Amino acid sequence: MNNFYKNNNNYGYLPFDLKQNHQIPNNAILILDNGDFFLGYNFGSQVTGIGELCFNTSITGYQEIITDPSYSKQIINFTFPHIGNVGTNFEDYESNGSFAAGIVTRQTPTRSSNWRSLNQFDAWLKDLNIPGISGIDTRYITKNIRKSDSTNALIFSSKKNKPNFNELFSLLKEHPSMKGLELSSNVSTKTSYSWNEGVHILLKNFKNKKRKKINSLNIVALDFGIKKNILRNLFDRNVNVVVLPQNSSFEEIMSHKPSGVFLSNGPGDPGATKKETFHLLEKLIKQQLPIFGICIGHQLLAITLGAKTVKMKQGHRGANHPVKNLKSKEVEITSQNHGFVVSKDDLPDDLKITHISLFDKSIEGLEHKSLPIFSVQFHPESSPGPTDSSYLFDKFFDQIIRYHNAKKN
């Protein structure tokens, strides 16, 4: 019998009334916005975490996942039971911290055992102020998410304070849905900076690849919540990379004399993005610059060009998602993390679908029919995940070369 109670079904039994401020025996509780709650064990920080509950099917790469800014305001339910076994390290950060609201796992994290480990998973989460709860039937949670629309959840843990269910549930119900939330401004860099680090090489003790930069080729990357491995892949294509805040002006972008513009991944509802961003993208498109977008960057490009985005029922999150390349007819295994998708309805004639999901046939890639503009919903930089789609960075580089040569002539 599972260690949880469900309001309308006899899935379990609690020998006390949680609504009467009894001490929870397992010291942590996960509450869903439909009233279901699950008892578990705390690890990480003892703070209350509230956010959209989502599930990730990746077997490895939990540090990269948790430090991906796209998980802002989300509680991550890991379907793989063993999380935290190899600890954490300096190389696997995808940002300078984490914006996740909480972590849910089946097994309680054990002490790490790995030659790369520099910190225990539990201690690392405490440093990041992220609450975790273990001992949860994560398969049941995943099925719950798949059956319902988007679900908000709350993690409460304390060895001293007794939970007041009514207060916690009220706090949870007040938390807004992800639909309509603009979050990129919370995770974007506040100042511009240059990036000069290539992809890590495991067999060379993580020393970066030595690349000779072509100083006349500049890429401006707009940061909506950018991952470090995206920047590494861009830098490895022999270009200078400068990262700008998501609210940068057209004049600031053009002052860097870009040969291409990259639109990054990021959290939140793309439709809630400020109008100024879409006006900016319209100006950039008129320059006929090569533009490449990933994740929310893909969605923002699509909206600017006349498409629409919709909230998905359960989203795509994992490192094992099959995508079909409609041009090559090949199947690419991809890393994904999104809860919104570009709608196939009323897709503008100027846009061509280049990739589709083999899970649900949703749009995974778009290309403009006459301009050097393309985008993908998935993550070709992986981290974690396969590198089947890393050729897309080469495609972007080829477009930049053609644009640069055309300007010289």
Sequence positions of predicted segments:
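Short solvent-exposed loop/turn micro-motifs enriched in small/polar/acidic residues
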Residues: N21-I24, H316, P348-D349, L358-F359
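Active-site glycine-centered loops adjacent to acidic/histidine catalytic or metal-binding residues
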Residues: D137, C295, H338, H379
